[in-house]
Amino acid sequence: MSDSKEPRLQQLGLLEEEQLRGLGFRQTRGYKSLAGCLGHGVLVLQLLSFTLLAGLFVQVSKVPSSISQEQSRQDSIYQNLTQLKAAVGELSEKSKLQEIYQELTQLKAAVSELPEKSKQQEIYQELTQLKAAVSELPEKSKLQEIYQELTQLKAAVSELPEKSKLQEIYQELTRLKAAVGELPEKCKLQEIYQELTRLKAAVDELPEKSKLQEIYQELTQLKAAVGELPEKSRLQEIYQELTQLKAAVERLCHPCPWEWTFFQGNCYFISNSQRNWHDSITACQEVGAQLVVIKSAEEQNFLQLQSSRSNRFTWMGLSDLNQEGTWQWVDGSPLLPSFKQYWNRGEPNNVGEEDCAEFSGNGWNDDKCNLAKFWICKKSAASCSRDEEQFLSPAPATPNPPPA
């Protein structure tokens, strides 16, 4: 019986040894002796417990690494989301427009899918609301107001006094015609024609017998009167006076052209049309003058009076176009401090780029250079000879010349 147990024990020993080898344990000589001493059962339990503890230790040691990997994965996902958000924020305007277009397309498709009945109901509701809004308009709506204005205008036209515009024009023409008829140019020929007309009427009214006699008498008296006229009759004297006056005028010195005004050795032209400041300079240059440059207080007072009389806004040759706030005349000379008193109160104020000066009211004003206004040209007067100056000046009273 003992002999049969020993082979079985050997087989068990070999099996345990292989299992331990599989678990990574190496049998030593001491181990074999110890196993032999303590018995195989207890040893197996101890070894199994030790193996389980070792495996558990290995698994526990792997937990922190898996947690760190999960954290790393979450960090990576967060970074990717951040980059994606930044990329979306950096989308071009074109992409945004495309998205809007897509939204609109989807909305259009959704609207087109509405049932026809729903569309009709919406249209009907809109029309109903519009009709209600129109019916709630006040009586005096825009069309009604326009109609009333036209009605009132028509009534006002129909109520115009008899002296309406056409009647006034007609009266003006009538007065003008009468004034023309009274012109002195109804001169000798017209008067002679009228006299002949009256004479013819008088002759026609004469009795047949006395007509020839009276005509003869009239002719005789006329002939006698003509014969008694002095050589220098009144008409001849007037003609001679006019001839002499014409010759004297032609000999006069003209320091300024016609329609120019003479003052202190200079000639001034005040325009009757309007131009902007730059074109006013050109207009003066075309007649050999320049846009007026003021040199004295007397000249300023004279020009200001001319401008205020006509109640016009008139350009002068002063601007601060070269440098804002530095006023300069067109001849390059600066504006003297003593002339700053001529600015109107609060001027110059450069409201809206006002860089050119004008006569305005009783003083000066700055205004926009591109505006059209009247202008004043200035140039030196022509010099007259000594004889002409004596001729122009009044002659002193002298006694009658001595007899020759």
From Swiss-Prot:
Residues 1-37 are cytoplasmic. It is a single-pass type II membrane protein. A motif (Endocytosis signal) lies at residues 14-15, 16-18, 31-34. Sequence repeats lie at residues 96-118, 119-141, 142-164, 165-187, 188-210, 211-233, 234-257. Ca(2+) binds at E347, N349, V351, E354, N365, D366. Disulfide bonds join C256-C267, C284-C377, C356-C369. Its main location: membrane. Residues 59-404 are extracellular. PANTHER family: MANNOSE, PHOSPHOLIPASE, LECTIN RECEPTOR RELATED (PTHR22803). Homotetramer. Interacts with C1QBP; the interaction is indicative for a C1q:C1QBP:CD209 signaling complex. Interacts with ICAM2 and ICAM3 by binding to mannose-like carbohydrates. Interacts (via C-type lectin domain) with CEACAM1 (via Lewis X moieties); this interaction is regulated by the glycosylation pattern of CEACAM1 on cell types and regulates contact between dendritic cells and neutrophils. This is CD209 antigen. The gene is CD209.
